[in-house]
Amino acid sequence: MIKKIILPSLSIFLFTACSLKMPEFSMPSFLSFSDDKDAIALEKANVCQKIEDMDNKLFCYRKIVNENSYAQLRMGTYSVEKKDYKKAIEYLNQSIDNENAYANLALAFLYYKGDGVEKDIDKAFKLLNDSSDIDPNAAYQLSRFYLQGINTKVDVDKGIDLLEFAASKNMLAAQKMLVSIYKDGLFSQEKDAKKVKQWEDIIKKDIRDTNFEVYKL
């Protein structure tokens, strides 16, 4: 379903041992840009992303990392893979300071797991919440908090709203979750054959889910 990416340690963002399965950690087919500067930054970072040789790829990113929030994001996730958490946190915070909402998910993972930082579920929740209206990945992960009452009271309506946002951006995992919810009546929802068919029809279109590309080195 999703290509293997450079950060296997982030491949499954598990908040709980519940049976709800999390998506692989990987970059959005849609990206919300606040201005042309942001789009240009992504374009420059994507030049590096397309380089196959790892040494040359890293050299490319390092040339632009001081000024490019997407390079900071990707070097951050790469540093997590290398277990250089100090550097990862530095890069990810740089990216967030430069208003890149996609870095929130990666940093939230570290705070949730307590990797390189003191474990802080409140911080993880806030980071996801702050980016959930932009990043489908963050919205999907945050839905788990609301559906299961992790660090907040159970709010099924909010959880489903977040799932629907992610699903509308072609996140396959969110689409499948909505099918399960309405087919099996999960989370005290009424079974709804019409909604099941709606999401199954979308899934059948087999549109490639590229919602994780933004994190790929």
Which functions belong to the PLM regions below?
Residues 60-61, 92, 128, 163, ...:
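Hydrophobic/aromatic packing residues within the alpha-helices of TPR/SEL1-like helical repeat arrays
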Residues 1-21:
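Classical Sec-dependent N-terminal signal peptides that target proteins to the secretory pathway
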